Amino acid sequence: MANNRNELNKNLAQMLKGGVIMDVTTPEQAKIAQDAGACAVMALERIPADIRAAGGVSRMSDPAMIKGIQEAVSIPVMAKVRIGHIAEARILQAIEIDYIDESEVLSPADDVYHIDKNRFDVPFVCGAKNLGEALRRVAEGASMIRTKGEPGTGDVIQAVRHMRTMNKQIRELVSLRDDEVYEAAKQLAVPYDLAKYVHDNGRLPVVNFAAGGVATPADAALMMELGAEGVFVGSGIFKSGDPAKRAAAIVQATANWQDAELLARLSENLGEAMVGINEDEIETIMAARGE
């Protein structure tokens, strides 16, 4: 039964392909995201830029706040739990959240083990910097992968690095002889059947989105160019001058990433972009959490 549920969850996540998932902190923001064409929203009390600025321990959001967002929109609602925090995940499943993001943006609850996602009915999203991380999360039951990037910075460089790393490792795995895949699986520290799937199909067994530092329509188009199947936008929208216009532009750019003339028009007069943090200035590297 768990296997059937896992396959169903993977197929559910496929329906989000080509879309944009936006971080929102209020029902009003959720409505702006829905009106802009977001395929889902991520409900959280503080966007990554504020979590980074505040420091301290960041935890799952208040269920009452999440319910307010669920009631405000008809699109799927996601919410984050700390890495390894089984109880937080059970709470979110109990309030009928659509997807759970086991997220490095929050303070990890367990520095060794991730949640056994196969024991849940609700689909999980997890971050990854490379192919090994991605396939380990899939083995644990993740229905969707996203690059970790570096959340709350407005700097897309790490998302680019993670996507390119994953693509390179996939190409390397595809190029191997069949009998070499066993050793590759061992080196990646992943189950053989998942390594074999990538070898045979040239892609992950689940949807792969881009996340971390996407702040402009051009950033979204770049990640699609590099093979992302959709985009998460966190701080980039509601930390900008004109959130509604920027949100709609990023949705359009993600769907039409090959149309440079349209991208040029979408990039005009968007108001002030979020103030970013350069990679060299980052004090806390969130992407290093939960490998």
UniProtKB/Swiss-Prot annotation:
This is Pyridoxal 5'-phosphate synthase subunit PdxS. It is an enzyme of class 4 (lyase). The keyword Lyase applies. Keywords: Lyase, Pyridoxal phosphate, Schiff base. Its EC number is 4.3.3.6. It comes from Bifidobacterium adolescentis (strain ATCC 15703 / DSM 20083 / NCTC 11814 / E194a). The lineage of its organism: Bacteria, Bacillati, Actinomycetota, Actinomycetes, Bifidobacteriales. D-glyceraldehyde 3-phosphate binds at residue 164. In the presence of PdxT, forms a dodecamer of heterodimers.
